[in-house]
Amino acid sequence: DLAIYQLPEPFRSIVKDEVKVINGCHPYGEALFERCVYGVFDPVGYDAEGDYGNEWANSIWISDRGISSGRLKDILLHEAAHAYSYLKLQHCMLDTGVSFRDTAHKRFGNEEYLADAFVYYFGGKWTNYYQLENLSIEDSNWIRDMITYCDWYIENKEFLEKTLGR
């Protein structure tokens, strides 16, 4: 629980309110990689056969291996970044009709690189995909502006939907 409370906003709220955190080996992750990986964000509840719809949808799995690695903070931050991308960024739209998630994927290369960019942005040091010493000032500013815009966008969208009864 302490690791969750140490997450930066907006990740802390998402993990506390919208995502289950499970200590264990994710069944589909283990089937795919033939080992228990450090962490997995599972938005739809995949089982070992790749079928989805199980009760662990919207979950972050952290394995014992991940906990004992000494990298728990960065692993949890990376997986929380996936949750933020899935639950928030894909619903945060630009005036072009493109989601900020798609825009961020184009900027950083893919979902894994985006999650690692968030690790760097929030001061983490260990990543698995995106190997940098530091995130550039330009990328840091871009992420900051994206978070600010999406917080504003989602808050106002929810207000309008509530006001209009949708």
Spans of features found by a protein language model:
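Metalloprotease/metallohydrolase-associated module, dominated by Zn2+-dependent proteases
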Residues: 96-166
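Sec-exported extracytoplasmic/periplasmic mature domains
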Residues: 5-12, 81-89, 119-127, 148
